[in-house]
Amino acid sequence: MFHHADKGGKKSAFGHPVCGQIILSIILLRPPLLVTAFPVNTVEEQICKDPGFPEHGIRTPSIGKFFENSVARFSCADGFSLKGPAKIICTRFYNGSLGWKPSLKPVCLSEDCLPPFIEDADVTNRTYRPGDSLIISCHEGFQIRYPDTETMESVCQADGTWDNQPTCQGCLRPLIPPHSYMNISETKFSVPVGTVVHYQCFPGYKLEGPELLECMYNLIWSDTPPRCLDVEACSLPPMIEHGDYTCHPHPCDRYIHGTVVEYYCYPGYSLANDYKYITCQYGQWFPQMQLYCVKDETTWPGFQDSLLTTWKVVACTATSVLLALLLVITAKMFHYKCKSQQSPSDEPDESRDPNILVVDGVAVPLPSYEEAISGNYCQPPNDLPPDGLESAQHSEEQNPPSYPGHTGSQNSVPLDTGDVENCDSLSDTSECLQGLQPSSSHPGGLNMSEKTNAITSMEETASTSPSIDIADEIPLVEDGEEDC
């Protein structure tokens, strides 16, 4: 219990009034020192941890302890640049602990600039020192562009970055109008010079504007993109009796622009004309023509079988005609061959007799065709020797033989100077004929009775008839008398 001095100048409990007041004031101002006891910080808690040294860098101070509010400074060796804060301070935080502020630890990096990645370009060098210029080449159809069009150069900075880094550009990907598509992938943001873009509209829309756009050398498009406008759909296509239609594309949900309708007829019917398609164009069917199915006049259930049967009939008919013609030709050829190759021995007995020509009642025997050709008439067949035969043939060639009725003519020449007698007078005619006619054993010769009758008739006629001159123009044998 404290006792204060009264107004009468009494002393306080401490013996002096002024000292008592000072002590009381100290106690009242510092109550925690007397009432509450806080723990005392250790030595480790009174300093900051060593921040270390950056690689290829320097720290100041390099040694010592860092108490509260101590400062550490950093720098890098030549050829490297500092990344991060250049100085840090040892600071006490709200929880009473000490730490570095800012907390980011600095590092020293190489000052060489790494090659940048530039789309649609190739970088020539792999490393660049500060102050070096970037060297690139753009792909074909792309052109180099710099952010700063006045500098037109990219330089490696001291901190390893590039200044005024360029890009390789083509024409920027054009816009795609609604309800349309084009032949450029959505992943491409630029296209090289010379690229042609083809625009097309979805079904039910028509294109308004240029269909093709080209990327020009100045990296702009040749024209503005087109638009796709909605068009009116066509109404139901006209129906046909005994037939139906189908749509392309199938199914026919809506007859939009470009829809094609194909007509067909039921079995037993066919279209009246060959055209069977109509197309929806801008809300109208084209061509505007009436299609209808007509009944087939003749149905062919098995067209292939009937076609084969028809060919069989035609082939059989042609074969029959050819065979008939071949038979006729063969028969005709055989007929001519038989006529040309028939021998005298094959003739009947009536034709074996020599032909006799009656002139003014005189029967004149004529030589056969073979005898006239060979020139052996009035020559005994087996009596002449070879020499006489040659002279007789020579005489025959110079002077033709005399016919009965010629008397003492200057053209009459002896047939032979040998044993053969001349036939100069009608009195010797019988003897001449008897010697000239072949024997009865020779084919085609006359029998004795026929010879006698012929000779008697000639002798009787020769005495009363004048000399007979037979013209040389009379044919010996008619060509048409020999038949097969």
Curated annotation (Swiss-Prot):
A single GO cellular-component term on record: membrane
Limits of the Sushi domain: 46-110, 111-168, 169-230, 232-295
Subcellular localization: Membrane
Glycosylation sites noted in the Swiss-Prot or TrEMBL record: N95, N125, N183
Alphabetical UniProt keywords: Disulfide bond, Glycoprotein, Membrane, Repeat, Signal, Sushi, Transmembrane, Transmembrane helix
CDD domains: CCP (cd00033)
Coiled coil stretches, renumbered: none
Biased composition regions of type Acidic residues, renumbered to the chain: 470-484
Signal peptide residues on this chain, from the entry's feature table: 1-35
Transmembrane segments annotated in the record for this chain: 311-331
Stretch list, region Disordered: 374-484
Main localisation: membrane
Protein name as annotated: Sushi domain-containing protein 4
Organism, as annotated: Danio rerio (Zebrafish)
Record lineage: Eukaryota, Metazoa, Chordata, Craniata, Vertebrata
Gene that encodes it: susd4
